[in-house]
Curated annotation (Swiss-Prot):
The modification N6-(retinylidene)lysine is found at K267. This is Rhodopsin. It comes from Leocottus kesslerii (Kessler's sculpin). GO terms for biological process: absorption of visible light; G protein-coupled opsin signaling pathway; visual perception. Gene3D superfamilies: Rhodopsin 7-helix transmembrane proteins (1.20.1070.10). The gene is rho. Photoreceptor required for image-forming vision at low light intensity. While most salt water fish species use retinal as chromophore, most freshwater fish use 3-dehydroretinal, or a mixture of retinal and 3-dehydroretinal. Light-induced isomerization of 11-cis to all-trans retinal triggers a conformational change that activates signaling via G-proteins. Subsequent receptor phosphorylation mediates displacement of the bound G-protein alpha subunit by arrestin and terminates signaling. The record marks E84 as: Plays an important role in the conformation switch to the active conformation.
């Protein structure tokens, strides 16, 4: 065993918590949206996509990790490793690109009156398709020989192999591709869209300083922007930073805990994504009651 039995018990307990909270919250999101017609709007499609992505991670990854943590190593073999790595990566990437699409949609929403643009169901479906295609460009290559999925950290879950330079897998090029396309670009887009959104709301508030409604809207949008950006950074910054450090320092000493902790952060959105992106929509709580 790479760590003490208490470490594996803690890992299993954390996975159980993610399943216990993540499954009902995301399932409830899907159920409530499908049951209430007023929630089935094009702008809410991407929130449904986010819930589906979280369920992928819960059912395809967290349950597996909880089971393998009871044994102290990944007991499901090469096929099991590929499947677990694929579902967790796919779910995580769908969620990531859903946040990008959501940021773009909200940015467009601010300027649609200026540009005479109407956000339709076709645009929403295009956003969903884009998030799935981008997720597939990250999750599929390790199955076909560009990089690979291997047990990582405490060896109870599988992820992309960013810490070895195995011959024949072109790990270096894939890690660089992942860091640029699946971390930096989404980060830039999210910062740009929410930054522009915040500026637009502040300009509107400045033009109507005496309007209490406008000032309240400014505060709500500002809070939403801060929470969304922090949520993205908490999820992906630790994982991307550690992966890049390990990649750039091949041969350095690092323990299993060092590689496992960032994965904890990357999996936590299955709980807080619904709370941030759905509960902040005032229609959802009313429909749940």
């Amino acid at each position: 065993y790479l760590v003490s039995p208490a470490g594996y018990a803690a890992l299993g307990a954390y996975m159980f918590l993610l399943i216990l909270v993540g499954f009902p919250v995301n399932f409830l999101t899907l159920y409530v949206t499908l049951e209430h017609k007023k929630l089935r709007t094009p702008l809410n499609y991407i929130l449904l996509n986010l819930a589906v992505a979280d369920l992928f991670m819960v059912l395809g990854g967290f349950t597996t990790t909880m089971y393998t943590s009871m044994h102290g190593y990944f007991v499901l073999g090469r096929l099991g490793c590929n499947l677990e790595g694929f579902f967790v990566t796919l779910g995580g990437e769908i969620a990531l690109w859903s946040l990008v699409v959501l940021a773009i949609e909200r940015w467009i929403g601010v300027f649609k009156s200026i540009r005479n643009f109407r956000f339709t169901e076709d645009h929403a479906i295009m956003g969903l398709g884009f998030s799935w295609v981008m997720a597939a460009t990250c999750a599929v290559p390790p199955l076909v020989g560009w990089l690979r999925y291997i047990p990582e950290g405490m060896q109870c879950s599988c992820g992309v192999d960013y810490y070895t330079r195995a011959e024949g897998f072109n790990n270096e090029s894939f890690v660089i591709y992942m860091f640029i396309v699946h971390f930096l670009i989404p980060l830039i887009v999210i910062f740009f869209c929410y930054g522009r959104l915040l500026c637009a709301v502040k300009e509107a508030a400045a033009a109507q300083q005496e309007s209490e409604t406008t000032q309240r809207a400014e505060k709500e949008v500002s809070r939403m922007v801060v929470i969304m950006v922090i949520g993205y950074l908490v999820c992906w910054l630790p994982y991307a930073s550690v992966a890049w450090w390990i990649f750039c320092n091949q041969g350095s000493e690092f323990g299993p805990i060092f590689m496992t902790l960032p994965a904890f952060f990357a999996k936590s959105p299955a709980i807080y994504n619904p709370l941030i992106y759905i509960c902040m929509n005032k229609q959802f709580p009313h429909c749940m009651i």
